[in-house]
A protein has these predicted regions:
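Transmembrane alpha-helices
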Residues: 131, 135, 167-200, 227-228, ...
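Glycine-rich helix-loop "coupling/hinge" segments at transmembrane-helix boundaries
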Residues: 120-121, 196-233, 252-256
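Generic hydrophobic transmembrane alpha-helix motif, especially the helices
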Residues: 104-140, 147-148
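Periplasmic/extracellular loop-to-transmembrane helix junction in inner-membrane transport proteins
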Residues: 2-10, 32-76
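Short cytoplasmic-facing helical segments at TM-TM junctions of multi-pass membrane proteins
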Residues: 144-189, 210
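C-terminal transmembrane helix and the adjacent membrane-cytosol boundary/short C-terminal tail
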Residues: 93, 150, 185, 227-256
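Transmembrane-helix boundary motif in ABC transporter permease subunits
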Residues: 73-103
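Transmembrane alpha-helical segments of polytopic membrane transport and secretion proteins
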Residues: 1-21, 242-256
Length: 256
């Protein structure tokens, strides 16, 4: 095994399947052999049996739809704010210096602290959940966009200047296109992070939602239902991650 060796597609698929099989086999051994109590690690059978109960008793599909809506809205709003502002901050250092004293410390804000804050500001209705997801996403997306712009190679800027490009042409035809692939990757990362916030977003007054479903299951000590809810979140997260990754490859094929 060489450092950073290239892996063929066929071998990559085999390694992925092997990894899944090993982890699933370990889960089966630990649970079916009762090496770990089922209140800690339910068996795959118990988790599978939880899905019909969640579907009929807790509206699993509707909850998944509500969570997807909330995460998507927070994600889109964060992108609408972070991308233009990040492009400005990455392109013009004075703007970055002006904004940095306020925006940089926000990266260290505990996300859980935003729950009571957004409740005070927006109440406990739907707006609070979307604003919470927006705030939790935008504070991390913004510096990634700034970094994407700053990482565009100066050689391209110097070449454009030498060829007589104006400042607006350099920004519109060099900096922005050059930073878009990294911004696309940042969006993919932040989509995943958004799903990690959904439990907190739906902890208060959410009749439907995967986070609400998991919170209720936790209060009832239904560990199998918690696992089932988590698996649904993981599934949706993986699918949306794949969709963004495919879109990035199609939009920025020239990058590779």
């Amino acid at each position: 095994m060489e450092i950073r060796e290239a892996v063929s597609k066929h071998r990559a698929r085999g390694l992925i399947l092997a990894g899944v099989a090993v982890f699933f086999g370990l889960w089966c051994v630990l649970s079916y052999a009762s090496l770990v109590p089922d209140v800690i690690l339910p068996s795959p059978t118990e988790v599978l049996q939880a899905f019909p109960r969640l579907h009929f008793e807790e509206a699993l599909v509707r909850s998944a739809g509500w969570s997807l809506y909330r995460v998507t809205m927070g994600f889109v709003l964060a992108a609408v704010v972070a991308i233009p502002l990040g492009l400005l901050m990455g392109t013009f250092p004075p703007i970055k210096l002006f904004c940095a004293p306020v925006l940089d410390p926000l990266r260290f804000l505990p996300i859980s602290a935003l729950v009571p804050l957004t409740i005070v500001w927006f109440g406990i209705e739907e707006k609070q959940k979307i604003v919470f997801l927006f705030m939790g996403t935008v504070v991390y997306l913004l510096p990634l966009v700034v970094e994407a712009v700053e990482n565009v190679d100066d050689v391209f800027l110097q070449t454009a200047t030498t060829l007589g490009a104006t400042r607006s042409q350099i920004v519109g035809q060099v900096l922005i296109p050059g930073s878009l692939p990294a911004i696309g990757e940042a969006l993919r990362v932040m989509n995943g992070i958004g799903w990690t916030y959904v439990i907190l977003a739906e902890v208060i007054n959410a009749p439907y939602g995967l986070g609400a479903l998991i919170n209720v299951a936790g209060k009832r000590s239904h560990v199998d239902q918690i696992f089932a809810g988590v698996l649904v979140i993981l599934f949706i997260g993986v699918v949306t991650d794949w969709m963004i990754r495919v879109a990035n490859k199609q939009l920025f094929a020239w990058k590779s």
